[in-house]
Amino acid sequence: EVERLAEKVKAEGIDGIFTGVHEFNLKRTRELCALCGMPFYATEEQLRLNFDKTFFKEQCVRAGIAVPESYTVSDPPLDAQLQAVRYPVIVKPRDGGGGVGVTICEDETELRQAIPGAVAGSPTGRFVVEEYVRGREITAVYTMKNGQISLSALRDRYPTKDHDRVTSQYDLSLMPSRYLPLFLAQSDPGFRRLLESVHAADGCVFFQGIAAPERIVFFECGYRLNALCDYHNIQDACGVSYLDMMIRYALTGSMGDADLSAEDPALPFFSGIFNM
């Protein structure tokens, strides 16, 4: 009921509209800001990086960023399609979020069983099948201000345990990442090209990937705040809070006067986030 919310915003004299980590809320907030004539940090194309995993991978390939191999599999799958699949693979909704409908598959039987869950987790009933890369999961966090792009943090994620056929849960996310030199050489230039290609000007974004010994592949984008709230760690380390900047943008249309050059992902100490 975005129209009713817009009426309430005007009636109550609301100064700004802001949202956090959920994809549904991002879409509604953008619509609400447009109705109320208030600033929102992301365009429809930029938000599509959140919602459409195939679109995100296409943009990565164009920018020279490594991504997992994709497989064409229909519902129900054809024998020829299944014969081309090399396991393990991960099956997930094309346009879902929050880990819903995501399954790791070691063989054809598990792949067939995973498809209905991925379809159910997609608002459009579409799913993707791609290479499951074994390695350390990492997250790259960028902040944008007036077209300036800054790598705010690179985090390594340490899992508690693997649950049956689903992605890992995490006890600890630690920065700086042990893979920072590899990331700076292989991935950072590509992400800057990607963000420039979608005309990223203000806001924050994170990219999730898997670091193997000699390569990093990326599979997910969040053009939004991330659920680990690492702005606390970044502010403690560098004195810059992208959360404060985002709130300021929602109120004024400007990210303020924070100095992004103070950010340095190569911290001289460790900073961690625990999942309790």
Regions found by a protein language model. Name each.
Residues 66-68, 88-90, 102-135, 155, ...:
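Conserved ATP-binding module of the ATP-grasp superfamily
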Residues 12-51, 64-71:
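A short, GP-enriched loop/loop-strand-helix hinge that lies immediately N-terminal to
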Residues 3-13:
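Short, well-structured alpha-helical segments in soluble
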Residues 73, 102-107, 143-145:
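Short beta-strand-to-turn element immediately C-terminal to the catalytic PLP-Schiff-base lysine
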Residues 89, 150, 217-220:
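Protein kinase-like catalytic core scaffold
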Residues 131-134, 138, 142-200, 204, ...:
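ATP-dependent carboxylate/phosphate-activation module, predominantly the ATP-grasp catalytic core
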Residues 79-81, 247-276:
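Peripheral (often C-terminal) accessory segments that flank ATP-dependent C-N-forming ligase machineries
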